[in-house]
Amino acid sequence: MSILSALTSISNPMKSSNSNVANGGSKLSMGANSVACGSCGGGNSSSGIINNSDGSQTTYYTYTSPTYQYGYTYSYGSSFSSSSCGCN
């Protein structure tokens, strides 16, 4: 099984680590499995925990800055993982 077919065979591997940008790109918040990389300069960052209806918990990170840095990480078994950080 190739990595591509392995990834497409599992149910939405990025669902728990999605991100969204709001307020003209000045705010970035990310869901579970996210890794905070820090800001690119200026602004504030914070994190917290959301209690989900199914009893699980989601840790979120929020950055408020003109420029921000974001990161995520996820894994499939022990054979595949990915992470990324960048500034926008």
UniProtKB/Swiss-Prot annotation:
What this protein is called in its record is HssA/B-like protein 6
Superkingdom, natural source: Eukaryota
Q: Which family does it belong to?
A: Belongs to the hssA/B family.
Q: Lineage, please?
A: Eukaryota, Amoebozoa, Evosea, Eumycetozoa, Dictyostelia
Checking InterPro entries in the record gives: HssA/B-like_chaperone, HssA/B-related
Example GO biological process term?
sorocarp development
What residue spans carry the region label Disordered? 1-22
